[in-house]
Amino acid sequence: MRFPLEVVDACCKIRDKYNKPEFIIGYRLSPEEPFENGITMTETMALVRELVKKPIQYIHISQKNFFQKTRRGEGIGVERLKVIHKETRGKVALIGVGGLYSYKDFTKALKSEFVEFIGTGRASMLNKDLGILLKEQRENDINLLLDPVHPELYSIPNMLWALCIKGGDWLPPVKGK
């Protein structure tokens, strides 16, 4: 745990050195690993408890499913973000992500009150104007799948488009696959 905390300290010192209080510093982490010897929520929570003492603005939790429940360690059976938010609430903003595509997905995530911010990657790749579609509650206009026949619908660079068509867990779901 010493290394990530020293990296955060170094970033904060540089911000102070150049007198840039507006420079936002955060920490992104994956909360739990599925393998036997992987990181558990116990280790994650120890790190989170130290991070909230630092002058950072956010902690970003990266996971496949926003509502994923803890498998091992602290908080077993409870949503990871809920466990983490108990520690971060009022101290540092928490950003959550994971498998949010539809208007209903985003609404459910917001209503959970597990986080201050919601991030999205794949849904943004599928919808150039996702923020507007969500704000205007245009549920039926939100693309949930990548249409491989119509690349013009997206702002995806050619190399990334080729990867998207092949498919992968970390890419948007593709129609017909």
Question: Where are the language model's segments positioned?
Answer:
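Flavin-dependent oxidoreductase catalytic cores
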Residues: 1-177
